[in-house]
Amino acid sequence: MIFSALSAANTVVLASGEADYTPSLVSFAWIMAAALLAPLVSYMLKNKMPAVALLIIFGMIIGPSMLDLAHEDPGIGMLKELGVGALFLLAGFEIDLATLKSKQAATGFSTWLICMVSCLVGAYFLLNDIPGAIVMAIALTSTALGTITPMLKQDKLIGTKVGDSVMIHGAIGEVAPITAMALLLGTRSTLGTMLILLAFIVIAVGVAVMPRALIVAVPWLKTAFLSGAGSTNQTILRLIILILAILMAVTSVFELDIVLGAFAAGIILNRIIPDEFHKGLENRLDVVCYSMLIPVFFVVSGMSIDWQVIVNNPFKVLGIPALILVTRGLPVFLRENIHHTGSDIETTRERLQVALYAATGLPIIVAVMTIAVGSGIVDEETSSIFVAGGALTVAIFPLLSSLVKGKEENAQSKAKAAESKQEGREGAEQKGAEKK
């Protein structure tokens, strides 16, 4: 009875409101239940399964293909888009532009280019279809920077050599595929797309300089913003959300992926916010974004996975993570081992960690498959297989990276313990010799 009343398909008015919103509200309730349950289950599993992976799994469970408790209607779809924006806003906020001008960034881009060209050639020979080959190459060579950023925070890797390297590979693995999608899969000509991208860059720069220009022109604005920053007005956070909204709207109007606008907003904030305010602002953004918007994105992404497709094509679904690991993770691992990339990573285990995180992909896979299905390049079943495979990379690769890190730490602890034990023995022998 209760489950029937809470079914997303039920259109009975549950409270004094419009009946049209009832399915959205019911779906939202189930989505937030999944969002709350995920970190609790992750804690029960001693954090061996990332909460992000559980959000996707629980989304699939409550979605149309399994329990059919929640659906992605326009209202939920809007929340999902805002979740994507919040996710990449925070990812961009973590990026230091100076690192993108480094040797490591140049090596990261050349590595991605090698991955992309190799996949493109291989897919073309297999499919004998250029649009299909482009779709496969983009899907197999992306990195889910926004998705792995919370995992890096959970594993306390932000600010470390491994974390910095992952952030660089992730930034390139997000922006480069998005640009490739716009140039190679767009309905406009290549020249038209390049002009659109140039126009977006000009607008983004304008948005970046506008706050400071306004403060110079109207000096009292700074005092007004600071006085309302910690009150119910929350002027600073509202300014940030306005910048995010403007750039997401611009990319949507220009028919670009909104990830590009959100990521640009994060980078802009990193530049215009003074360093001494970064930590406090980041904590407040975490509260705003991770309490609702970002979990909604992951749960709704899980809801879009067709369980029946996984059951009918288990080997194909399992093959996608393996293929991504070979086409994206392996080149990153090999470049880190045989070439001085500037990352200063010393151990093989750390390089393996970077490779596993770099091979984690989902948002770009979802985006490129959505475009491909809409254009008739791939069918719904192929899209579901790739999305399910992308979700598996989110569930598996960060977990493997954590295990690799754990083994490394255990090995270091054992080595230190053995060293201390040996020093103790030597000290005892020395004392015994002195007594004699």
Question: Regions from the language model: what does each represent?
Answer:
Residues 126-138, 148-195:
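Membrane-interface helix-loop-helix junctions at boundaries between adjacent transmembrane segments
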